[in-house]
Structures are given as C-alpha cells and as structure tokens.
C-alpha cells in the first residue's frame, strides 16, 4: 500500500497555515511549523521533484532518522513515514521521478528508501561517514553520487553493491551539488573541484578557492537557458562567493559578499561572524537564500548584487534550507549546529522546521 494518501504520522506537534499569528522567539517570522520535527539537530532538507503531484518534504537529523511529510495546499503538514540509520543522517535527495529517497549517514552507508513500499535498503558503503548524496540523471545512465570523509567520490548503480566508479579527492568531502551535466565538490583544506558528468563522470577543473576560510556549503546556479553556469560557495566566515565556470570577465563577474554578521561596523567594534550553513537557489527566479549560525535567513539577487530580505533572528541557528519545485515554499530548519561547542547545547530546546510563502520575496530587483 502506498504511503501517499495514508496518514502514518509519527507523533504530535504544532502546525499552522501561512500567516499564523504566533510570536514566539523560536518563530519570529510567524511561519508555518512542520508537525513532528526530529528530536535532534536537523542536517538536511529536500522537497519532492516536479514530477510528483503535491509537495513532500524530506528531513534528516542527528537523531539518525529521515522523515517524510506531506505539505498540503493550505500549509498544513502531515507526517507520512520515517526510516532509521545507525548514525546521524547528513544528506538526503530524491530520484527524478519522486519514487525513491536516498540518504547518507555517519554510519558509512547510503540507503535507498522506496516511499511506496516504505522499505529502505543499503546501496552504498564508504570507509568513512558519507557527507553528501546526489541523484544523477543523464541521457545514457542514472546513478547516485556519494561524497565521503574517506576522500573519495563514488558513483553507484542502485542495483549493484559495487560502485560504477570511484574518484580520489585531495581531502574530505565537506559539501557538494549536482545540476546535470555539472557537479561541484568542496573539500577540507579549501579544496574545490568541478566534475563533468556527460558520458561518464570525470574531473573537469580544480579551482583555487575564492574564500579564505573553511567551506561549508555549495549550490550550483543556472543561466537563462537553465544550463549550470557557476556556483555559490559559503564559508564559516560569514561570506559567500559567486563563481562562474567560464565567465567572459572573471575579475568582474566573480565576486564575494559578506553575510550572517552582526553588531560591530568597524575595527574598533569587531563584528560577530557566523557560518553560512546552507545555500539554495530559487528554481524560477534564480535568486538565492542563505541561512546561518546567527539564526537568520537572507534572500539575495546575485545579478543585481543586492539583498532582498533578511529575517528576524531566531533563538537558535538555521541549519538547512530548500525551495519546493516551483519556488512557492521556502523550508528552513532551526536547531543547534554546535558552532559554539557543547557548553551552549540546551537539550530542552526543540528543533523546528518552518515553511514560508516565498512566491513574492524572491523576485529579482527590477532593472532600472
């Protein structure tokens, strides 16, 4: 029996509709609270692809679980199912047809979760925790790409226990993104590698990092023809780099900007600087969202090089974000990211996932 259309909720929790009136410090933007969030820090979020009717949200957490919610048209969320790993879940993704979800964990395995049967099977194995997982749909092949702290990038046919290909990286994989035919992987020690995926995956170029501090997140952006043309890279130093792969004028087209900083404005009063935890591009407008350890999200227009909006400050960091397939819903997760160490961890604090109506706020600035 399909899970879609049945309510197999896993507990109770608060929810609402767009425009609810709560004013708690955990939800200063008055956004919709997703029902039954995970019991530990939320590491990743992913919305279902456009091939699926409706909107389904997947979230992975440090409680070793992956959860699925249906997001109804009125903003209500219905818990559908969950699966477990034996270690924290670090990344999730969907197959292009929406029938499968893929999960990557610190337990050194990746799993394929069939949502119709609610069965999950192991499809990948590394010698270290798996940090990233992406579905690749090429004209001549489809596979899963996993990036690990064992310094390898592996490509898996889900029907085979052995990888189709294994590529060595100079360092541990910290973040990655895929928009066919491009993949970008950022590693420890500020490594940055672009891969081309046509015919078969291969290393295309190593790039000197435009950022001076540890890489935290990366997201590929597209041109007006929907072809991947560059990426945004976020670091722990409250900064994002916009980098084109083949820009007409590299010195002019590539740039960095500061974000997720507060207080001080000059050298006499230093700024508080926070990590950029996630970056997500709007699927229609090409604008982007960043979320940070400062507990804020911001929306940006990279082409106009301007900020569109910054949220009020939540009472804990924002650890993950994503847009649904048509860009109408922005999901973001609020939970502790351990950026201030164990002494700032409060086990009494709940974790939250919020949904925001993003149809208007992400529209690019009008060109004058």
From Swiss-Prot:
Region listing for Disordered, in residue ranges: 15-37
One of the record's GO cellular component terms: nuclear pore
UniProt cross-references to Gene3D superfamilies, sorted A to Z: YVTN repeat-like/Quinoprotein amine dehydrogenase (2.130.10.10)
Keyword Cell division appears in the UniProt entry: yes
InterPro entries with a match to the protein in the record: G-protein_beta_WD-40_rep, WD40/YVTN_repeat-like_dom_sf, WD40_repeat_CS, WD40_repeat_dom_sf, WD40_rpt
Signal peptide start-end: none
Entry keywords, A to Z: Cell cycle, Cell division, Cytoplasm, Cytoskeleton, Mitosis, Nucleus, Repeat, Transport, WD repeat
Species assigned in the record: Danio rerio (Zebrafish)
Annotated GO MF terms: RNA binding; ubiquitin binding
Protein name as it appears in the record: mRNA export factor
